[in-house]
From Swiss-Prot:
Predominant subcellular localization, coarse grouping: cytoplasm
Tagged with keyword Manganese: no
Organism: Cellvibrio japonicus (strain Ueda107)
Source species taxonomy: Bacteria, Pseudomonadati, Pseudomonadota, Gammaproteobacteria, Cellvibrionales
Annotated family: Belongs to the ClpX chaperone family. HslU subfamily.
GO cellular component term of the entry, any: HslUV protease complex
Name of the gene: hslU
GO terms of molecular function: ATP binding; ATP hydrolysis activity; peptidase activity; proteasome-activating activity
Protein name (Swiss-Prot/TrEMBL): ATP-dependent protease ATPase subunit HslU
């Protein structure tokens, strides 16, 4: 679990996301509260439940990006799902409990990586010995003199191995045979049975090994992974992963507005109100059965987000609204925001384009007025057509640099992208509403 303070979390998010300070502060406080809760005595800890969040804002302003970056910072089991993927129990589609099953799988993978990292040094030593056994097979019935000589030869080879002098040498080693891959098409709601059958089939022949030729460098990596897997306990990993999911798990549900009842629409809302009602016990706290054991969802943090351009947060069923007490509104982007998005974030869009074309020897320079014109064009097109937020910048940059990208590689050159260049390449398209609707 990350022990970063809210200010540090916001500072990290600022490196990648422009503006939206309210949303950043809300998720930073929620993440820090997870850490604070873990410092409490056990009896008090069980009483403190997370305050779930609803992020509201137009598309392309940073809701999903905040979730992506938060996942990297959290150092806790984190899963992002779209609400539109799920349907009411009994209908074709995934039921909402599969969110928790997927979260458990993520936690086990995370815990296994941590456990294997902890035994990496011992695994490397064991892998080294196995490679030396292949390079210098131990002789039978050797005298004391011969065994001393063999030991000194082994040390010479060990030194060469550690220095990388034997990396390209090809050897034949015994590696664990790949498990049998079985794909089972199961009806909705039967994922549990499917996973159990897949586990049963994959365990067949797990103990078998096969001889494989590979370089010492590849063999060392493979043997190290094998040895690390022997040193860690799968049972402990599962137990700790389930505990981590219950105490620190975070679920991000995107497109929550798409399952809200829209105004005066009548008819069966299979994938709407039913999904909301199925989400209620999950968010409130219930016990979900997974193939690894039972998981209580009482202390899992749920962050939901939606554009709400065809519906309103009040269109969600009242019970669900009550379980999302923290509301954060994200602001629509201005030309100044677009300008900052092009230059400020780590690995910004302009830096990415410069780096890509530099591989072909093309040097691109964006001037300040060029960046301003790109930002203004993106804002204008968003205002006159569909507002897709910062995603519009991708479309405009690709269109602007289309000719440069096509001719790159034929000759090395330096291109200066200023206001005049942007107007020459995008001016007519941006002004013509019919064309910009389809091309930009």
């Amino acid at each position: 679990m990350s022990s970063m303070t809210p200010r540090e979390i916001v500072h990290e998010l600022d490196k990648h996301i422009v503006g939206q300070q309210d949303a950043k502060r809300a998720v930073a406080i929620a993440l820090r509260n997870r850490w604070r809760r873990m410092q409490l005595p056990a009896d008090m800890r069980s009483e403190v439940t997370p305050k779930n969040i609803l992020m509201i804002g137009p598309t392309g302003v940073g809701k999903t990006e905040i979730a992506r970056r938060l996942a990297k910072l959290a150092n806790a089991p984190f899963i992002k799902v779209e609400a539109t993927k799920f349907t009411e129990v009994g209908y074709v589609g995934r039921d909402v409990e599969s969110i928790i099953r997927d979260l458990v799988d993520v936690a086990i993978k995370l815990r296994r990586e941590q456990a294997m990292k902890a035994v990496q040094y011992r695994a490397a030593e064991a892998a080294e010995e196995r490679i030396l056994d292949v390079l210098l097979p131990p002789a039978r019935d050797t005298s004391e003199e011969e065994s001393k000589h063999e030991s000194s030869t082994r040390q010479i080879f060990r030194k060469k191995l550690r220095e990388g002098q034997l990396d390209d040498k090809e050897i034949e080693i015994d590696v664990a045979a790949a498990s049998v891959g079985v794909e089972i098409m199961a009806p909705p709601g039967m994922e549990e049975m499917t996973s159990q059958l897949q586990n049963m089939f994959s365990s067949l022949g797990r103990e078998r090994t096969k001889k494989t030729k590979m370089t010492v460098k590849k063999a060392f990596k493979q043997l190290q992974d094998e040895e690390a897997a022997k040193l860690v306990s799968e049972e402990d990993i599962k137990t700790q992963a389930l505990e981590t999911v219950e105490q620190n798990g975070i679920v991000f549900i995107d497109e929550i507005d798409k399952v809200a009842r829209r105004g005066n629409v009548s008819g069966a809302d299979v994938s709407r109100e039913g999904v909301q009602r199925d989400l209620l016990p999950l968010i409130e706290g219930c016990t979900v059965s997974t193939k690894h054991g039972m998981v209580k969802t009482d202390h899992i943090l749920f962050i939901t987000s939606g554009a709400f351009h065809l519906s309103k947060p009040s269109d969600l069923i009242p019970e669900l609204q009550g379980r999302l007490p923290i509301r954060v509104e994200l602001q629509a982007l201005t030309p100044d925001d677009f300008e900052r998005i092009l230059t400020e974030p780590k690995a910004s869009l302009t830096e990415q384009q410069q780096a890509l074309l530099k591989t072909e020897g093309v040097d691109i320079q964006f001037t300040q007025d060029g960046i301003r014109r790109i930002a203004e064009t993106a804002f204008d097109v968003n205002e006159r057509t569909e507002n897709i937020g910062a995603r519009r910048l991708h479309t405009i940059l690709e269109r602007l640099l289309e000719d440069v990208s096509f001719d790159a590689g034929n000759d090395t050159s330096s291109i200066r992208i200023d206001g005049a260049y942007v107007d020459a390449h995008l001016g007519e398209l941006a002004k013509n509403e019919d064309l910009s609707r389809y091309i930009l």
